Amino acid sequence: MFMINLLVVILSALVAMAFLTLTERKVLGYMQFRKGPNIVGPYGTLQPIADAMKLFTKEPLLPTSSTSTLYLIAPTLALSISLLLWTPLPMPYPLMNFNLGLLFILATSSLAVYSILWSGWASNSNYALIGALRAVAQTISYEVTLAIILLSVLLMSGSFNLQSLITTQEHSWLLFPSWPLAMMWFISTLAETNRAPFDLTEGESELVSGFNIEYAAGSFALFFMAEYMNIIMMNALTTTIFLAAPHNTAAPETYTINFMTKTLLLTTLFLWIRTAYPRFRYDQLMHLLWKNFLPLTLALCMWYISMPTLTSGIPPQT
């Protein structure tokens, strides 16, 4: 039974990722007053399948000066990590119910840095290496903020378990008491997934394509798939942490519909931000974190830590 559940989660994530690429191209198209993909299938709905066939049937090229082992392992590792992150997410029941689910997600997502670093170094290209170093610095920096925000949320829910987070939000979303944290979390997830306006790793005018410049065919597709699955996973996590729906045991499908709708809206917001905002300069990106987000998140974390002590003398309200 576990293997069937695992296959269902993997296939669902892959299908969602495939159609997210189509949605992005459609949204970008309409926002720029053009149609987007509309040739393959009705209204272009089969475009992701055509893209997959094209990429996976092309000849995989290995640069002669590259370190072949790491060069081939890096995209596989990126995709494996992005799939592994889905295991503790409650949809409405998780694949594996960890007591430390949030800690597992934070620790596993930080491993994605290695795939980027290995791909940049193993490609033996200056552009790829600079893109990889940028990505690593950016990801590690913003993980600090994500960890502190998660700690603040845990102080409100009292557990690392994602199911208990949903129980905490049975009557009210955690978005309301912690909206500054939610705003900083959302912006940090943009930076964590290397999306515009924080896509410094793929600065076309400077780095051609970034850390994946030497990749083609199937290996390039694996990086592409990992990036888009991380986007959906991060938005699913945002929904669970700040916008969780009450879990009705009599009709669990209502939770799934609610969860999917909110995740889809947040993902569409990711795409809208890409069309609306120009790319940040690298120093602005780092200043935003180290000079703005970090002091604010630390101050708010201290506030949430001190709240139980400050309110301990207040009698219970009946």
From Swiss-Prot:
Catalytic activity: a ubiquinone + NADH + 5 H(+)(in) = a ubiquinol + NAD(+) + 4 H(+)(out)
E.C. number(s) listed in UniProt: 7.1.1.2
Entry membrane topology: Multi-pass membrane protein
Key words, A-Z: Electron transport, Membrane, Mitochondrion, Mitochondrion inner membrane, NAD, Respiratory chain, Translocase, Transmembrane, Transmembrane helix, Transport, Ubiquinone
InterPro entries cross-referenced by the UniProt entry: NADH_UbQ_OxRdtase_su1/FPO (IPR001694), NADH_UbQ_OxRdtase_su1_CS (IPR018086)
Transmembrane segments: 2-22, 70-90, 98-118, 140-160, 171-191, 217-237, 253-273, 294-314
Example GO molecular function: NADH dehydrogenase (ubiquinone) activity
One GO CC annotation: mitochondrial inner membrane
GO biological process: mitochondrial electron transport, NADH to ubiquinone; mitochondrial respiratory chain complex I assembly
Localization per Swiss-Prot or TrEMBL: Mitochondrion inner membrane
Family to which this protein belongs: Belongs to the complex I subunit 1 family.
Protein name, as recorded: NADH-ubiquinone oxidoreductase chain 1
Gene that this polypeptide is encoded by: MT-ND1
